[in-house]
Amino acid sequence: MFKATARYIRVQPRKARLAAGLMRNRSVVEAQQQLSFSQMKAGRCLKKVLDGAIANAESNENIKRENLCVLEVRVDVGPMFKRMKSKSRGGRAPILKRTSHLTVIVGERGQ
């Protein structure tokens, strides 16, 4: 099993989980194709993390890309940046800029 992570990504976890669903339980090649045609920002971020996990597998254990599949995709909630928006009569409303931690684990088929 080979893991790659990206932390503090400025994508809402709810939207990143939609993109993560495109690659669950697929071979690595299929997952890359799915993410490359996705127009979501989270899809681009997940593709970079997936490429990192594939590079870890190829460089550390000399495993071919065709034999790899996505074992686990995890999208966790990161810290939130808090901003304020001006409202009427001197009031204000909170704005939460959400972040995500992305984790992709790949391994050989049958693990």
From Swiss-Prot:
**Which controlled-vocabulary keywords does the entry list?**
Ribonucleoprotein, Ribosomal protein, RNA-binding, rRNA-binding
Q: Which GO molecular function annotation, any one, does this entry have?
A: structural constituent of ribosome
InterPro entries cross-referenced by the UniProt entry: Ribosomal_uL22, Ribosomal_uL22_bac/chlpt-type, Ribosomal_uL22_bac/org-type, Ribosomal_uL22_sf
Any Gene Ontology CC annotation: cytosolic large ribosomal subunit
| Record-level GO BP terms | translation
Subunit details: Part of the 50S ribosomal subunit.
Q: Which HAMAP family match?
A: Ribosomal_uL22_B
**What role does it play?**
This protein binds specifically to 23S rRNA; its binding is stimulated by other ribosomal proteins, e.g. L4, L17, and L20. It is important during the early stages of 50S assembly. It makes multiple contacts with different domains of the 23S rRNA in the assembled 50S subunit and ribosome. The globular domain of the protein is located near the polypeptide exit tunnel on the outside of the subunit, while an extended beta-hairpin is found that lines the wall of the exit tunnel in the center of the 70S ribosome.
Record family assignment = Belongs to the universal ribosomal protein uL22 family.
Name recorded for this polypeptide:
Large ribosomal subunit protein uL22
Q: Please tell me the species this chain comes from.
A: Chlamydia trachomatis serovar D (strain ATCC VR-885 / DSM 19411 / UW-3/Cx)
The record's gene field reads rplV
